[in-house]
């Protein structure tokens, strides 16, 4: 009888200990390039989940049931935004309602790249800078991470977001960023 009581006490102690330990947030990232940035910031803490796997393009991707489940469990979702991943707009509103959703294309200071012609960046000039802030970047190159300054700005946003969601690991995120 004492063995049974000791076993129950041990299981309760283990169970209570597990429930008080803070788990890392469930982080979902839309594309491989962004996943690389987020993985770097989360190194040593947790591994973010990649939504679009393989050689699939975010421009023509159809969300699978497994992807829907991943979004439902997400606490944080990083994506470029509707300009690149339009398929994600509705699922993020309906499936990831509880998640902190971060469109990295909206990061302050991001420079949207011009269309590439013959492997050379085209210009992305506007007559008025105010006109730049509100437009949807149609026709621009959405591969924002190719500009090192953009990548730095996105990493800063990733660090700040993860620190807000997971303050216990704030220093690790800062060190990795």
Which ranges hold each PLM region?
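Positively charged n-region of N-terminal signal peptides that target proteins for export
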Residues: 1-5
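Bacterial N-terminal signal peptides
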Residues: 6-17
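Extracytoplasmic metal-acquisition and chelation regions
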Residues: 15, 23-177
């Amino acid at each position: 009888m004492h063995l049974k009581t000791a076993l129950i006490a041990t299981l309760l102690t283990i169970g209570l200990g597990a429930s008080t330990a803070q788990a890392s947030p469930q982080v979902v990232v839309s594309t491989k390039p962004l996943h690389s940035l987020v993985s770097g910031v989360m190194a040593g803490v947790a591994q973010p989940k990649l939504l679009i796997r393989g050689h699939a393009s975010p421009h023509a991707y159809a969300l699978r049931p497994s992807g829907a489940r991943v979004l439902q469990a997400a606490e944080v979702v990083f994506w470029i935004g509707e300009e690149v991943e339009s398929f994600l707009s509705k699922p993020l509103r309906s499936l990831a309602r509880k998640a902190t959703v971060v469109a990295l294309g909206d990061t302050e200071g991001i420079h949207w790249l011009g269309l590439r012609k013959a492997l050379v960046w085209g210009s992305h000039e506007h007559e008025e800078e105010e006109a730049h802030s509100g437009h949807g970047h149609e026709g621009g190159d959405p591969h924002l991470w190719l500009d090192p300054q953009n990548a730095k700005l996105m990493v800063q946003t990733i660090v700040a977001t993860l620190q807000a969601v997971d303050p216990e690991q704030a220093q690790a995120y800062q060190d990795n960023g």
